[in-house]
């Protein structure tokens, strides 16, 4: 029967150096524990170990080997294994099998990078699990991109053709994904700062409304307001007196509101005031 083992580039696992041919474990074999032993798996279980490396070893078990198959585990172990050949994981012909690929991306979104024939269904399943696997999508559709940014707004970084709808979905999920928006509109910026006031730092064209909404969501966003008005500063310190530290021009009214909200904010009052 053909078995497999996923290996890293160094082909070293738990201090054991694997090689082509016969590999013999240096530790005493114990069939009562998963510890020690040289592990391997069936073809259908390779998917459980994709994150362990980029190499795939084709394994057979010598007749004289001591073997233990673990129930409810996706692996087995032996005191010796024979590695017939080692290939790059990306070159495995199973990546041409659509059903196999679909199952793979459902377990590891980034395995999309190995899929030879990417279908929209496969890509959608990949980004549902890991939004950043959008990076590996060869033919991006709006549907795939929307699914990705709904999972993580930061996936917008990998969207090749941004639409306003995609950008809005991204900043609704994570306001700071505004940093990846190529064409900012006031609506997109407002959505972004309403989700996370700190997104104001990425707004290219600040308006009074955008700044006001930003400090309403997060008073510390006052730090990023380029044109501080008394109204905006008051909104910030009314919510958190400590926001006084970001006020450039401290008026008496602002100071009073700040210490009223938090007496300890007085430490940010200039002595010379």
Positions of PLM-derived features:
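ADP-ribose/NAD+-binding catalytic cleft of ART/PARP-like enzymes
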Residues: 1-35, 54
């Amino acid at each position: 029967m053909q078995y497999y083992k996923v290996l890293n580039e160094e082909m070293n696992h738990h201090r054991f150096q694997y090689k082509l041919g016969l590999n013999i474990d240096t530790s005493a074999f114990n069939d009562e524990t998963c510890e020690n032993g040289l592990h391997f798996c069936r073809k259908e279980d390779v998917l459980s170990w994709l994150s362990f490396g980029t190499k795939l070893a084709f394994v057979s078990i010598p007749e004289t080997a001591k073997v233990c198959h673990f129930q409810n585990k996706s692996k087995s172990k032996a005191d010796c294994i024979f590695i017939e050949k080692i290939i790059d994981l990306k070159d495995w012909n199973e990546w041409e099998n659509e059903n196999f690929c679909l199952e793979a991306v459902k377990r590891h979104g980034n395995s999309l990078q190995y899929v030879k024939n990417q279908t929209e269904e496969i890509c959608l399943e990949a980004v549902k699990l890991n939004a950043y696997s959008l990076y590996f999508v060869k033919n991006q559709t709006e549907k795939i991109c929307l699914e990705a940014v709904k999972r993580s707004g930061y996936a917008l970084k990998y969207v090749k053709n941004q639409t306003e709808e995609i950008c809005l979905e991204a900043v609704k999920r994570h306001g700071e994904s505004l940093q990846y928006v190529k064409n900012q509109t006031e609506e997109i910026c407002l959505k972004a700062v309403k989700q996370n006031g700190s997104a104001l730092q990425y707004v290219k064209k600040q308006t009074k409304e955008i700044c006001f909404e930003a400090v309403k969501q997060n008073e510390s966003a006052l730090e990023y307001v380029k044109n501080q008005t008394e109204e905006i500063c008051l909104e910030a310190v009314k919510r958190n007196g400590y926001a006084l530290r970001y006020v450039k021009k401290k008026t008496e009214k602002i100071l009073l509101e700040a210490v009223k909200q938090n007496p300890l904010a007085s430490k940010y009052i200039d002595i010379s005031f």
